[in-house]
């Protein structure tokens, strides 16, 4: 174990191993990402500095935007922006990363943009070779590929994402994972009436970005997969929060964050309605990187933009204590997410990948003591 992560394990006072499968209620894990959604919006809601045309580039009238997303306190603002996160998830799980309360979460890849972040998140360790979003096929197997190689999970692992680069991040040629990403039409063969409409939208909609399909377009085939294929390990990547920030449209950042929260709620409700998922599913919700925080800096991210390394992580499921917003706890890092996904399924990812960071053990056991 490297010294870089060893102190985290000691502070959490639990072994950095997969939990015994017999002691866990979780049988399904969903890792959900909203690309580039800042911790500031997660914990404080709409940013007053950006609720205007000058800094936030808003096209909506300021009065209308304030009516929808502005409230007197950070707690009220975050709840109106992200109601599912701050009602259901906060009541049933844990939310980490509020720096104002001594809860720190950050990346360790040294770049603070998407491909290096997803590699760190999904493989459990950073890779300095991955220094571009155009890097190409990932040389590092992800925890999803590893889990798909286990007999009990083979063929029960899927990826749905708006960004076409996920086909490289998950290296589909090597992993053979089903990765639905970008503008590839989601259906094949005989289509239902609803599927035919969505297929036409995929093929005929004007693309603001050739690499990113709209979040809403992803949601329908995602929900179909839940009903039809009984996926047990699922990755879901939404992208509009990052895209609209790069476009300098803070009003649409807020709208897309609000819709992201709705999509997560919709996915949770759909899974809880299925007997195979009900009360046996854990959600891990996070982001790949932060952003800057000034009147111009919020649009961008990268190691040169201070604050881009800061992220947030939320966890909800049958094996996570309902502690809500965490405060004054040890720092967690993005690399710990991979082993955490595996640990909820009773698997020790670090035994197979010693370079991986340990799981976030404090979210793994209702019986563990301390806060």
Feature-to-residue mapping (PLM):
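Acidic, His- and aromatic-enriched active-site or binding-groove loops in soluble protein domains
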Residues: 123-136, 176-214, 218
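Non-catalytic, well-ordered alpha-helical segments in soluble enzyme domains
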Residues: 144, 151, 328-365
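Substrate-binding rim/cap in mid-to-C-terminal beta-strand-loop elements of soluble/periplasmic
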Residues: 118-124, 300-347
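Metal-dependent active-site segment of extracytoplasmic phospho-/sulfohydrolases and closely related
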Residues: 30-31, 39, 259-299, 341
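Active-site His/acidic residue clusters
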Residues: 172-174, 220-266
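Short, structured active-site-proximal loop/turn typified by the sulfatase FGly-forming signature C/S-X-P-X-R
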Residues: 40-111
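Structural recognition of the beta-strand scaffold that forms the well-ordered cores
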Residues: 29-33, 40-41, 96-99, 120-122, ...
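Hydrophobic h-region of N-terminal signal peptides that target proteins for export
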Residues: 10-20
């Amino acid at each position: 174990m490297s010294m870089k992560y060893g102190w985290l394990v000691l502070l959490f006072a639990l072994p950095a191993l997969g939990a015994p499968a017999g002691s866990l209620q979780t049988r399904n894990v969903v890792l959900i990402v909203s690309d580039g959604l800042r911790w500031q919006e997660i914990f404080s809601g709409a940013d007053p500095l950006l609720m205007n045309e000058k800094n936030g580039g808003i096209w909506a009238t300021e009065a209308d935007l304030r009516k929808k997303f502005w409230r007197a306190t950070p707690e009220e603002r975050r709840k109106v922006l992200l109601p599912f996160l701050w009602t259901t998830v906060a009541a049933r799980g844990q939310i980490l990363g509020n720096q104002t309360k001594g809860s720190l979460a950050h990346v360790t890849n040294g770049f603070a943009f998407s491909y290096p972040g997803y590699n760190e998140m999904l493989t459990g360790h950073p890779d300095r070779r991955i220094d571009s979003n155009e890097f190409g096929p990932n040389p590092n197997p992800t925890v999803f590929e590893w889990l798909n190689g286990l007999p009990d999970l083979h063929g029960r692992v899927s990826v749905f994402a708006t960004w076409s680069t996920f086909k490289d991040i998950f290296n589909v040629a090597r992993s053979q994972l089903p990765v639905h990403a970008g503008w590839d039409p989601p259906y094949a063969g005989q289509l239902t009436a609803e599927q035919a409409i969505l297929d036409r939208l995929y093929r005929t909609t004007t693309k603001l970005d050739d690499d990113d399909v709209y979040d809403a377009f992803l949601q329908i085939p995602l929900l179909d997969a839940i009903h039809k294929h009984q996926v047990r390990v699922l990755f879901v990547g939404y992208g509009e929060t990052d895209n609209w920030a790069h476009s300098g449209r803070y009003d649409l950042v807020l709208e897309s964050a609000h819709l992201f929260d709705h999509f997560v709620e919709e996915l949770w409700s759909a899974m809880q309605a299925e007997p195979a998922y009900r009360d046996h599913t854990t959600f891990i919700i996070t982001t790949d990187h932060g952003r800057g925080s000034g009147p111009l800096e919020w649009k961008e991210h990268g190691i040169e933009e201070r604050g881009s390394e800061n992220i947030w992580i939320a966890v909800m499921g049958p094996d996570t204590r309902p502690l809500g917003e965490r405060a004054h706890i040890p720092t967690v890092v993005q690399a710990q997410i991979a082993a955490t996904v595996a640990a909820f399924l009773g698997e020790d990812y670090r035994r197979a990948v010693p370079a991986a960071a340990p799981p976030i053990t404090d979210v793994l056991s209702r019986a563990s003591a301390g806060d």
